[in-house]
């Protein structure tokens, strides 16, 4: 999955940086594997509109040249003009700083609340899916639902820039497509891969569906599934299910 562009004849400052993203491979050793951190960086680079290449890394057969490139490091990581960077949060900050306007899109959210929306969902989901005690299942499911409800309320609450102070109309519900508005931001790159895992895994191993009444979340997911930046960086549902086959505990008496 390599994208390239000829650099001949360009000034130094106009040249695209040489970026390679290394992500976790799927069960076949080649396709995109289940890793929300890999997808997060994949989405950021895609949204930035920068030329980059992608290498899937089979963790069972990690090539020697990769061992030398980033010893002891699991994907995701990047090389940026041959410099290896391995910390996902720092990579995000670095890319936002160096791939900046006017040449590249700014992806930081305008509203600080967008950065923390849904941040506790994945922890509640993990506790729910790893539990093997039937008597604890209901309480853990309620805990997950509570965090999903909180996200749903945020997505349905109008952002300040959706409210026109000069308008007589009272806007009660947001119609925005993503967390921070109608365009994806870093906050979406962080949350959407995790939210997708929750949807797929909870259905497969607990027959749990995100309630249809959570219209904000379903609007959000529907909009995400319509975007190449999300769907083309996403592992298949089967890969997600395989990744959780040993993690998801059966409820046993």
From Swiss-Prot:
CDD domains: GST_N_CLIC (cd03061)
GO molecular function: chloride channel activity; oxidoreductase activity
Top EC group: oxidoreductase
Transmembrane regions: 37-57
Record-linked Pfam families: CLIC-like_N, GST_C_2
UniProt key word Membrane: yes
PROSITE patterns: GST_CTER
Membrane topology summary: Single-pass membrane protein
Modification N6-acetyllysine occurs at: 24, 130
Modified residues (Phosphoserine): 4, 132, 167, 236
Record keywords: Acetylation, Cell junction, Cell membrane, Chloride, Chloride channel, Cytoplasm, Cytoplasmic vesicle, Cytoskeleton, Ion channel, Ion transport, Membrane, Mitochondrion, Nucleus, Oxidoreductase, Phosphoprotein, Transmembrane, Transmembrane helix, Transport, Voltage-gated channel
Induction comment from the UniProt entry of this chain: Up-regulated by calcium ions in differentiating keratinocytes.
Keyword hit for Isomerase: no
NCBIfam families listed in its UniProt record: O-ClC
Record remark: domains: The active G-site contains a monothiol Cys-X-X-Ser motif which mediates glutathione-dependent redox catalysis.
This protein's name: Chloride intracellular channel protein 4
Protein species of origin: Mus musculus (Mouse)
């Amino acid at each position: 999955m390599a994208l390239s562009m000829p650099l001949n004849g360009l000034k130094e400052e106009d040249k695209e940086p040489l970026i390679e993203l290394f992500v976790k491979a799927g069960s076949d050793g080649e396709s995109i594997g289940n890793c929300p951190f890999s997808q997060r960086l994949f989405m950021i680079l895609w949204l930035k509109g920068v030329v980059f290449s992608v290498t899937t890394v089979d963790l069972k057969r990690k090539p020697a040249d990769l061992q030398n490139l980033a010893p002891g490091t699991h994907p995701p990581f990047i090389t940026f003009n041959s410099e290896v960077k391995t910390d996902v949060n720092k990579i995000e900050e670095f890319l936002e700083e160096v791939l900046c306007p006017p040449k590249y899109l700014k992806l930081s959210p305008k509203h600080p609340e967008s950065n923390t929306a849904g941040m506790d969902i994945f922890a509640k989901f993990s506790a729910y899916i790893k539990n093997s005690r039937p008597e604890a299942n209901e309480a853990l499911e309620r805990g997950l639902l509570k965090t999903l409800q909180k996200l749903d309320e945020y997505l349905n609450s109008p952002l300040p820039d959706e409210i026109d102070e000069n308008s007589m109309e009272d806007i009660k519900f947001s119609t925005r497509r993503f967390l921070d508005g109608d365009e994806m931001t870093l906050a979406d790159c962080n949350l959407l891969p995790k939210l997708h895992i929750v949807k797929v895994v909870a259905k497969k191993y607990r027959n749990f569906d995100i309630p249809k009444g959570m219209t904000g979340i379903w609007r959000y997911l529907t909009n995400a599934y319509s975007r190449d930046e999300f769907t083309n960086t996403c592992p298949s549902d089967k890969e997600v299910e395989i990744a959780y086959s040993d993690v998801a505990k059966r409820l046993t008496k």
